[in-house]
Amino acid sequence: SYKTPIEQIKAKNPKGIIFTGGPRSVYLDDSPRMANEIFELGVPIFGICYGAQFMVYGLGGTIGKANENAAAEFGRTECEFDTTCPVFDGLKKNSVVWMSHNDYIEVLPEGFKAVGHSDKCPYAAIENVEKGFYATQFHPEVNHTEQGFDMLGNFLYKVCHCKGDWTMKNYAEEAIKQIRAKVGDGKV
């Protein structure tokens, strides 16, 4: 959650962080925000739609207001990707994604480059390899985005180096171990 204190996030020692999308604008006072310290944790971050705009704005880039002539896109949109970017590694160079935004990335922060674009959106996907920061103006998490789950998987496994070996059995064993440690010889 955007409301999670930075100390709590540090304590969890995350392998990566994903900023989700939403209908807000970074210029509104009541928009979800985190302390900019989040960018100094040394862990990979993936921003989705509003999350991408939040990242860009927080790191010194500029967010513009979309209109019929400037990057307004809603629905299925054809994008072209740089497949040397780890997020798009092994994927098709051209793909349909789901766009839904009123604001757009106008100027990139220092160290970022475009790794995906559409006809109206020059920064449909961006990266800062040195920091491990990636972002998409579109929504890879929805079914309408072709290869979207593969993009998220690439972030988790190729960028964050997560293992993907979680099972319900492992969870149950770990939960039982933690409960026993708390309860001791007591009855549960």
Question: Which residues fall in each region the model found?
Answer:
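Conserved G/P- and acidic residue-centered "switch" motifs that form tight phosphate/ATP-binding loops
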Residues: 49
